[in-house]
């Protein structure tokens, strides 16, 4: 497996999900209300549905290439955020956003409904690499203390 093309697709899908998430906030009318945790989960869910729709148009779109087998990318992005939060680099959870584990669970449920065998295989490999990466980050953090 060539890493660079997968990394490129993964990055594009993560970025695409962020855009879809923000579009979902707009379409769900969240921009007119005070932000709260359920809105974020709703925007994650709707944003994933938008991303899935884009992935189903993979063959028709000339430049936007998000194949269905990379739909686990939003979950992987949240796992990255969880790792950064765990070692104290960022803080995401608060009054307006649900915990990262809640968002991972919500997005994983969406992914699991949509994923085929190839998407699950790729997701599992990426998830396991995240686990190794998080372990290494924790070792480096502990070594510097």
Q: Which sequence ranges carry the predicted segments?
A:
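Short pre-active-site segment immediately N-terminal to the catalytic Zn-binding motif
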Residues: 1-17, 34
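General structural signal for secondary-structure boundaries
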Residues: 2-6, 36, 42, 97-102
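Active-site recognition of the HExxH zinc-binding catalytic motif
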Residues: 17-30
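Short, flexible helix-adjacent loops and helix caps
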Residues: 28-35, 56
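An active-site-proximal "capping" alpha-helix that borders the catalytic cofactor pocket
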Residues: 36-54
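Long, well-structured alpha-helical subdomains associated
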Residues: 53-145
């Amino acid at each position: 497996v060539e890493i660079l093309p997968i990394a490129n697709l993964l990055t594009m899908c993560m970025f695409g999900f962020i855009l879809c998430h923000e579009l979902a906030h707009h379409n769900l009318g969240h921009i007119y209300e005070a932000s709260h945790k359920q809105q974020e989960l709703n925007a994650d869910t709707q944003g994933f549905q938008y991303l899935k729709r884009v992935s189903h148009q993979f063959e028709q779109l000339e430049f936007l290439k998000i194949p269905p087998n990379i739909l686990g990318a939003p979950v992987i992005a949240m796992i990255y955020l969880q790792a950064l939060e765990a070692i104290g680099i960022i803080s995401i959870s608060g009054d307006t956003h649900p915990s990262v584990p809640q968002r991972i669970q919500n997005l994983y449920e969406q992914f699991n409904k949509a994923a085929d065998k190839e998407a699950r295989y790729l997701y599992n490999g990426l998830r396991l690499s995240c686990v190794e990466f998080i372990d290494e980050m924790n070792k480096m953090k502990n070594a510097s203390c």
